[in-house]
């Protein structure tokens, strides 16, 4: 066993079983070595549970079957196992059947501790069972947190060009340089093998990797925290090896090229027995000012987890890719709250000034609209000025109509979103999503592709205030009715930390009357000096606040799962108080700046962005 792998497994044994030094070494020496090829199953869900395994080399995936056999639901990926971690603890304790299946992403080596050997050690160390049970509880907590293992401890990444890529060499150099600022990194291409002393003669068209080359690659992986495999342009033995060895695959496409998957790409990545490694698409554009369009043509027909845009030699976007690979990218979630959402504009400026990167944006209602503006990647000044034009000068809340479908026609809102936020979601420089709900059954919709303005029209269609939006011949309404702070959706993305801005209020509404006054009494109180004045919320405020009530508990629950929750003091502002735009933005900025400074002082993993 290589030194680094030995130390990782030894540390895991000590952590799980609470034994040290010679006892831990003795347990390690008593483990049996197991080799498993990429794509093969270590065991399947429902198999007899009779052993615990420690991963020495490679990477594994945890899969669970749908609860109802034969249902339309597909097996679900729970997470990934990385070197030094263990699998099968529950089975060793209970002796039942496997609650999940374990499949190798790439060729992997494990050490096996069977029940008999475990019981032998338990006699010598009575606390072994309790120590293992505690370790299981901790691991279950880690593994059930959404997104927690998305890019955790990647050891190998394959860069696979989808055609001629004259920019590839420069990109590899910049990517490797950025990674080396963080961890020990080695970049390997077919041209590098001979220079580095690899047994290149061992390469063959066969899928299996010859032993001499396998040992050479293992040594490189042991000496470096991360290996970057650069595949050839096309189907070659080296390209096959790169894909087979990868924990994660980055498909590299030139935005101006033919987006249709080639025959060799389909064969290597999507045929039976192909790798199950996570994959993402990186689309290269000539320069930062190049328009992004037709991304959907690259996404169709490809099974990818996410995609990113790389404009020219942008250091900022190269750094975003690095953060995604290292598991410390930042997702920003913006909640709904009508005019109080202007505070999110200020929070964004505070993040930008503090150097906090934004690698993914998601939001609901007003948060979705502001989030889409942020995803254009034009900076805080652009977002502030265009938000002011849209909501203060555009007056979308003053578009009253005959209240048949709603109080507001929604024409102004539609016109504003069409004008300021054109294009498709998948073409945005920063990945984005927003939330809406189906009117007929309340099912949540996550908008990640298609027309930006249509998605925003849906996420902000507050029932009673604005007419429902039409999406695929279904009526949809404001996402605040089902998920007003979609941190859970962001946790499913490849982000390491989540910053959320919650602009809902906990204010108590108290009145000085026992029965609701009539509309005429309210009007009289406003017009006639000697009449009693009644403090009552307007119909729009009632509609907006009512929409929040149903998800208030969920918002509080979601907020606990954010790494940084920013709650600007905006309760003094009304839900339609667009005239206070600048004051609300300032309130969000001041509060966020203070909270961000505290957060960054405590979490050294927050890496300032590269502009």
Question: How does the language model describe each region?
Answer:
Residues 109, 115-156, 293, 300-329:
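Extreme N-terminal, non-catalytic leader segments
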